[in-house]
Amino acid sequence: MRVAVYPGSFDPITNGHLDIIKRGAKVFDKVIVAVLVNVDKKYLFESSERVELIKRVTRDIENVEIRSFDGLLVNFLKECKTNIILKGLRTASDFEYEFQMAFINKELDDDTETVCMMSSAKNIHISSSTVKQVARFGGDISGLVPNEIISDIMSRINL
């Protein structure tokens, strides 16, 4: 069974993330969406909330599992009994960052492999940061995130 781990903050999950999850689920037998817990970072949603939001928008994808993790990704991979990291790339700067991270992960565990998927053209401009910024200024985020979570984002932004 080929299992890939798709790690990220997903704060919040975007249509770009969801696209990578759906496409990854067609390539791999199982995709584990790994929601990063970083106590040093300020998030819009707590990790448990991010897990629930992702579960809500992926409920119809049978071979997707959502989990949170902290610590080194290579250790989480071992826990998941896989060596494959799935990453989405939007821009050249994403590539440069993920290229470096792939080498770091390979240095930490030589069995680790990173598989990158190019973003779909319709999602190349979407990032969680952009979603939050647009929402904070009252803009329409309906084309940026799954419809099921728009109210969650807007109510959190407007606290």
Curated annotation (Swiss-Prot):
Q: Report the record's disulfide bonds.
A: none
Amino-acid positions noted as binding ATP in the UniProt annotation, renumbered to this chain:
9-10, 17, 88-90, 98, 123-129
Pathway participation? Cofactor biosynthesis; coenzyme A biosynthesis; CoA from (R)-pantothenate: step 4/5
One Gene Ontology MF term = pantetheine-phosphate adenylyltransferase activity
Domain of life where this protein originates: Bacteria
Gene3D superfamilies attached here?
Answer: HUPs (3.40.50.620)
Which keywords accompany this UniProt record? Answer: ATP-binding, Coenzyme A biosynthesis, Cytoplasm, Magnesium, Nucleotide-binding, Nucleotidyltransferase, Transferase
- The positions annotated for binding substrate are 9, 41, 73, 87
Q: Its quaternary structure?
A: Homohexamer.
Q: Name the cofactor(s).
A: Mg(2+)
Q: Where is this site: Transition state stabilizer?
A: 17
Q: Which PANTHER family does this entry report, sorted A to Z? A: PHOSPHOPANTETHEINE ADENYLYLTRANSFERASE
Q: Kindly give the InterPro entries that the UniProt entry links to this protein.
A: Cyt_trans-like (IPR004821), PPAT (IPR001980), Rossmann-like_a/b/a_fold (IPR014729)
Species whose genome carries this gene: Clostridium beijerinckii (strain ATCC 51743 / NCIMB 8052)
Its function, per the record, reads: Reversibly transfers an adenylyl group from ATP to 4'-phosphopantetheine, yielding dephospho-CoA (dPCoA) and pyrophosphate.
Give the gene that encodes this protein: coaD
A biological process (GO) annotation for this entry? Answer: coenzyme A biosynthetic process
Task: Spell out the subcellular localization from the entry.
Answer: Cytoplasm
Q: State which Enzyme Commission number(s) the record gives.
A: 2.7.7.3
Mostly located where?
cytoplasm
Report any Pfam family annotated for this entry: CTP_transf_like
Q: Which GO terms describe its cellular component?
A: cytoplasm
Name by which UniProt lists this protein: Phosphopantetheine adenylyltransferase
Q: Does the keyword Nucleotide-binding apply?
A: yes
Q: Which family does it belong to?
A: Belongs to the bacterial CoaD family.
